[in-house]
C-alpha cells in the first residue's frame, strides 16, 4: 500500500507536473530543440499510461512492481539517460512510420462509421419522438371526446337526477372519480320518472291538476261574484217592473151624456 502511494506521487510529480512546466518554458522561449524533446517525451508517456492501465490490473502482484514503475518514469525524464528520446527513436518512430497508412485508414473508417451511427441514432430518436407525440395527441383527443360526451344530451337524459355522475379523466385514470351534476339539470329529484317523455307527461298531469284546482278553488269566488252581480241585476229589474206595475192607473172619466132636447 505504501509503495503504491509513493509510486502514484512520483508519477504525478515527475511524470506530469514537471514535464508540463518544461513544455510551457519551451513554448515561451520558442526553442525548437526543446519542442522536439518534449514532444517525444509526451508520445512515450502516453503509451506508458496506456500500458500501465492494464499492468496495474494483471501484474500488480509481481514483486517490486511499483518500484520498477517509479524507476522507469525517472529513467524517461532524466536528462542524463534521456530514455524518452531513446525509446522514441529506436522503437516508436519506426513502428509508426510502417503502420501509418493503416492507422490513417482505420481512423477514417472510424469517423465514417461514427457519423453513420450518429445519423441512425438521430433518426431513431426522431421516430420515437414522433410516435410519442402522435400517441399523446390521440390520448388528448380521446380525453376531449370523453369530456364532450359527458355533456351530451343523450347521456344527460339517460341519467336520473338523484344519482351523481362518476366521471374519470382519460389522461389521469388513477385520480379519484369526480362527483358532479351536469349543467342544465334541476336539483329536485324525480325518482318515479325514468325518461324525458314520462317527465313531460308528469308535468302535463301536474298542469292539468293545477288547472283543475284553479277551477275549483280561487276562480269559484269570481264566479260567485259574477253570479251575485247577475242576481242583483235581476232583482233590480224586478223592482223596476214592480214599481211600474204598482203605479195607479188613471181612471177614465165617463162620457157625459148630451142633454135631451
UniProtKB/Swiss-Prot annotation:
Region (Disordered): 167-261
GO cellular component: cytoplasmic microtubule; endoplasmic reticulum; endoplasmic reticulum membrane; endoplasmic reticulum tubular network
Subcellular location, record wording: Endoplasmic reticulum membrane
An example Gene Ontology molecular-function term: microtubule binding
Pfam families (UniProt xref): TB2_DP1_HVA22 (PF03134)
Transmembrane residue ranges: 1-21, 35-55
Major subcellular location class: endoplasmic reticulum
Biological process (GO), any one: nuclear envelope organization
Family matches, as InterPro entries: TB2_DP1_HVA22
Keywords: Cell cycle, Cell division, Endoplasmic reticulum, Membrane, Microtubule, Mitosis, Transmembrane, Transmembrane helix
Membrane topology per record: Multi-pass membrane protein
Stretches with biased composition (Polar residues): 221-230
Tissue specificity comment: During gastrulation, expressed on the dorsal side of the embryo and then in the neural plate and neural tube. At tailbud stages, expressed in the somites, neural tube and otic vesicle.
Function: Microtubule-binding protein required to ensure proper cell division and nuclear envelope reassembly by sequestering the endoplasmic reticulum away from chromosomes during mitosis. Probably acts by clearing the endoplasmic reticulum membrane from metaphase chromosomes. May play a role in the maintenance of both the nervous system and the musculature.
Record note on quaternary structure: Interacts with microtubules.
Family the entry assigns: Belongs to the DP1 family.
Extra facts: Inactivation in embryos by antisense morpholino causes paralysis and shortening of the body axis.
Record's protein name: Receptor expression-enhancing protein 4
Species assigned in the record: Xenopus laevis (African clawed frog)
Name of the encoding gene: reep4
Amino acid at each position: 500500500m505504501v509503495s503504491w502511494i509513493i509510486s502514484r506521487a512520483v508519477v504525478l510529480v515527475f511524470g506530469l507536473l514537471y514535464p508540463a512546466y518544461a513544455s510551457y518554458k519551451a513554448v515561451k522561449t520558442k526553442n525548437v530543440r526543446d519542442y522536439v524533446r518534449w514532444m517525444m517525451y509526451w508520445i512515450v508517456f502516453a503509451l506508458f499510461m496506456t500500458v500501465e492501465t492494464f499492468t496495474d490490473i494483471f501484474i500488480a502482484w509481481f514483486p517490486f512492481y511499483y518500484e520498477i514503475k517509479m524507476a522507469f518514469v525517472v529513467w524517461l525524464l532524466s536528462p542524463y539517460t534521456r530514455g524518452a528520446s531513446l525509446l522514441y527513436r529506436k522503437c516508436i518512430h519506426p513502428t509508426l512510420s510502417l503502420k501509418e497508412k493503416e492507422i490513417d485508414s482505420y481512423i477514417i473508417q472510424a469517423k465514417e462509421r461514427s457519423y453513420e451511427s450518429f445519423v441512425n441514432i438521430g433518426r431513431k430518436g426522431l421516430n420515437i419522438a414522433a410516435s410519442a407525440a402522435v400517441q399523446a395527441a390521440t390520448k388528448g383527443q380521446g380525453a376531449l371526446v370523453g369530456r364532450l360526451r359527458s355533456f351530451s344530451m343523450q347521456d344527460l337524459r339517460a341519467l336520473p337526477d338523484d344519482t351523481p355522475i362518476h366521471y374519470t379523466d382519460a389522461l389521469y385514470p388513477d385520480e379519484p372519480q369526480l362527483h358532479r351534476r351536469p349543467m342544465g339539470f334541476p336539483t329536485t329529484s324525480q325518482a318515479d320518472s325514468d325518461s324525458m317523455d314520462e317527465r313531460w307527461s308528469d308535468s302535463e298531469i301536474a298542469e292539468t291538476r293545477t288547472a283543475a284546482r284553479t277551477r275549483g278553488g280561487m276562480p269559484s269566488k269570481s264566479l260567485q261574484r259574477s253570479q251575485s252581480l247577475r242576481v242583483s241585476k235581476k232583482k233590480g229589474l224586478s223592482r223596476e217592473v214592480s214599481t211600474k206595475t204598482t203605479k195607479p192607473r188613471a181612471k177614465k172619466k165617463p162620457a157625459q151624456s148630451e142633454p135631451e132636447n
